[in-house]
Curated annotation (Swiss-Prot):
Record-linked PROSITE patterns: MRAY_1, MRAY_2
Any Gene Ontology CC annotation: plasma membrane
EC number from the UniProt entry: 2.7.8.13
Annotated organism of origin: Mycolicibacterium gilvum (strain PYR-GCK)
Cofactor(s) annotated in UniProt: Mg(2+)
Cellular compartment(s): Cell membrane
Signal peptide, first to last residue: none
Keyword Magnesium: yes
HAMAP family in the record: MraY
Protein name: Phospho-N-acetylmuramoyl-pentapeptide-transferase
Annotated family: Belongs to the glycosyltransferase 4 family. MraY subfamily.
Main localization, broad class: membrane
Length: 359
């Protein structure tokens, strides 16, 4: 628990101190965000707000992770794990794709960055590498960071994927979550606040897995997760970094995370869900992100098949703005829904454990 608190504190401090530095730097460089002409009229005043603030989030997570492990090595001799480095590697790779996308947008002074093919290839490469490596690095207990068995709260033994199918599954998971968080990042502080809550839920889940790991506490209801404490540290660091960034990103935002941050944060959810064996539970925890990306898919399918739109604008947080909700009202209500979803997800996780142990 001490390491988790250290991780939160370091990440929060780095993000909250580095973000204003980036604001000044990007403002001097003229790296102002371009706004869609067909977006809500209230967003036009945001034109010129610095973007690429996700750099502060990623930096906060990395500094926190290694800072926490430096303390950990001094206390118990344990350093970074394969699971932790894989999750951070995935998030950083996606962050690089997002950074290039943001940079091109800012250089061209238009809301179009990497073309779809280049962006898709970048995400695909990161996802494939993650999927392949997730089945490597077997520890002394025979556990790898990922599992070929499909998981809800723990592995479903009746559904085992072939290695190639598992990699394809990882591609779907990574692509879905990175795009889901990316679509959600359309209102000041919405994605950062929601992400902090999802990661807080993952801290509880992975720490519980650590306290009830089969490797150290074998018995009914134990969890076969390779590095649960390290995953808890990453979740805590991400929550702290998002809160620190939110200090400057809350409405009215002084900086946006950009694709640099949103793609990286999507990678965090994808990586945590695979390495903690909770791919299906993550859909509940991240219900807001799922709803946002679903609204985009529904809008596209409806328009292509019927020529009509279901929402005034997608992602659907813009729909509520266009029907008269104030931006801050949408944000706060969506945060409340995220808190409810996270509470439900944690409750489902814990109730499954109670059922398993017969409590």
């Amino acid at each position: 628990m001490r390491q988790i608190l250290i991780a939160v504190a370091i990440a929060l401090a780095v993000a909250i101190l580095l973000t204003p530095v980036l604001i000044r730097l990007f403002t001097r460089q003229g790296f102002g965000h371009e706004i869609r002409e067909d977006g809500p009229p209230s967003h036009h005043k945001k034109r010129g707000t610095p973007s690429m603030g996700g750099v502060a989030i990623i930096a906060g997570i990395w500094v926190s992770y290694f800072g926490t492990h430096l303390v950990g090595v001094l206390m118990d001799g344990k350093g970074p794990s394969a699971s932790g480095l894989l999750v951070l590697g995935l998030a950083t790779s996606l962050g690089v794709v997002g950074f290039l996308d943001d940079l091109i947008k800012l250089r061209r002074a238009r809301n179009l960055g990497l073309n779809k093919t280049a962006k898709t290839v970048g995400i695909l490469v990161a996802a494939v590498l993650f999927g392949v490596l997730a089945l490597q690095f077997r520890n002394a207990d025979g556990l790898t960071p990922g599992s070929a068995e499909l998981s809800y709260v723990r592995e479903i033994a009746t559904v085992t994927l072939a290695p190639a199918v598992f990699v394809l599954f990882c591609v779907v998971v990574v692509s879905a979550w990175s795009n889901a968080v990316n679509f959600t990042d359309g209102l000041d502080g919405l994605a950062a606040g929601a992400m902090a809550m999802v990661c807080a839920a993952y801290v509880l889940i992975t720490f519980w897995q650590f306290r009830n790991a089969c490797a150290t506490a074998p018995g009914v209801g134990c969890y076969n997760v390779r590095d649960p404490l390290d995953l808890a540290i990453i979740a805590a660091a991400t929550a702290g970094a998002c809160i620190g960034f939110l200090w400057w990103n809350a409405a009215p935002a002084k900086i946006f995370m950009g694709d640099t941050g949103s793609l990286a944060l999507g990678g965090i959810i994808a990586g945590l869900s695979v390495t903690s064996r909770t791919e299906m539970l993550a859909v509940v925890l991240g219900a807001l992100f799922v709803a946002e990306v679903t609204s985009v898919v529904v809008q596209i399918l409806a328009f292509r098949t019927t020529g009509r739109r279901v929402f005034r604008m997608a992602p659907f947080h813009h729909h509520f703005e266009l029907v008269g909700w104030a931006e801050t009202t949408v944000i706060i209500r969506f945060w409340l829904l995220t808190a409810i979803a996270c509470g439900l997800g944690v409750a489902l996780f814990y109730s499954e454990w109670l059922t398993t142990v017969g409590a």
